[in-house]
Regions:
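Short S/T/G/P-rich N-terminal loop/turn motif that feeds into the first structured element of a domain
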Residues: 1-70, 74-93
Length: 93
């Protein structure tokens, strides 16, 4: 069964979301990431959804996210609220 990280972000400014999206596009997805979505949900908020084939892959991505949050992204991201769980329904076209 696939597992997912659902991560809520609060950014310093609305421009910070665009800066993050550019950074993420340039750095690519995390290793073994099957699906990656990043959606603006408000002026300074967004949500990311990342799906992984195994719990170990998800945990490895958590470590990388935490490292990036404390270094590369610390100036533009105000708060990161990660959640995780099993993927129960998965549709792609």
């Amino acid at each position: 069964m696939s597992v997912a990280n659902v991560t809520m972000f609060e950014f310093q400014t609305s421009e910070s979301i665009e800066e993050f999206a550019s950074w993420y596009k340039g750095h690519g997805t995390y290793p073994n990431n099957d699906i990656s979505l990043f959606v603006r949900t408000g002026e300074t908020s967004a949500i990311g959804i990342s799906v992984y084939p195994t719990e170990q892959d998800r945990q490895n991505a958590d470590k990388l996210r935490n490292e990036s949050a404390s270094t590369d992204l610390s100036e533009i991201v105000k708060e990161i609220m990660p959640l995780s769980g099993d993927v129960l329904v998965h549709f792609l076209r």
